[in-house]
Each structure stands twice: as C-alpha cells, then as structure tokens.
Amino acid sequence: MMSSKVQERDLIVSKIKDGIVIDHIPAGRALIVLRVLKLKGGEGRVALVMNADSRRLGRKDIVKIEGKELSNDELNLVSLIAPTATINIIRDYSVIKKFQVKLPETVKGVVKCRNPKCITNQPREDAVPTFRVLHLDQPILQCQYCGTYLTIDDINAQLTGER
C-alpha cells in the first residue's frame, strides 16, 4: 500500500465531488474527447491531464468533469475515440461505479461514409450512415451499404470537424 505522501505527490488534479473521470484515454486524444462531448469549460469544472504515466498504456490522458453524467450516445462517442477508456462515476468524492467503455456492434448516424458514391451521401436518399465495428482495439468501421472502411483517423477527423 502506498503512503499518503506518495499518493499526495502523485495527485496532479484535485478530486471532484460529483461527476465523471474518463481514465486510460490514449495519449493525445483527451482534447478530441472534450470536443466530441461538446465541452468548452462553462458547464462546470473540467480538468485535463495529458501524457500521464500509465502502466497499462505507457502514456495516457485523463479527463475529469464535475457535475456531468454521460448518456449512452456520449459513451459510444468516447468508445470510438478512446476504446481503452475507463469511466469512473464519482459521488461525494468516491468512485461508486467503474467500467470500461464498450464499442457498440454498429454505429448509426454518428459519422458519414467517406465514399461520395455511397447511397448515404446521395441527397435524394434517406439512408442513415450505418457502420459495423470490425476491430475493437483500434476501431475500424465498415459501411453497411457500400463496404467502405473508416479508420480511427477518419473517425477522429469527422468527429472533430477537421474534414
């Protein structure tokens, strides 16, 4: 067991009373997580730690959001950006629930197919972009309609508005 001095030394950001901690985000992706959750800082206290040491990942990012709970849709977005993420639900400064995000089997209406000829990109069609999730560690999505693949870079770019 660690001494309290070691624990205090390792505590980079103060504890939050109520909210969530998104831990084990791959290094460099915390800002993307904030963007897809549409958090700008005015919602309450948001703490961000980037490139922290991690036994599991080598380096990781951490996001703490006070007064926030994630919907299932938001959890799915986080899982696309950070499939290794762990969610900690905090109440009265204690972790009451902890779980790893899980990629859904299909992703519907979140990202667009990058194939311009796909039926989902045709203005006269009412097809909603739907993808099968193929790889769980580094998500690769396959369009249900045309078979085009989206990589993690494609997903990140679309979710952050960079494409």
UniProtKB/Swiss-Prot annotation:
It comes from Caldivirga maquilingensis (strain ATCC 700844 / DSM 13496 / JCM 10307 / IC-167). This is Aspartate carbamoyltransferase regulatory chain. Contains catalytic and regulatory chains. Binds 1 zinc ion per subunit. Zn(2+) binds at C113, C118, C143, C146. Pfam families: PyrI, PyrI_C. Belongs to the PyrI family. GO terms for biological process: 'de novo' pyrimidine nucleobase biosynthetic process; pyrimidine nucleotide biosynthetic process. One of its GO terms (cellular component) is aspartate carbamoyltransferase complex. One of its GO terms (molecular function) is metal ion binding. Its cofactor is Zn(2+). The keyword Metal-binding applies. Involved in allosteric regulation of aspartate carbamoyltransferase. Keywords: Metal-binding, Pyrimidine biosynthesis, Zinc. The keyword Zinc applies.
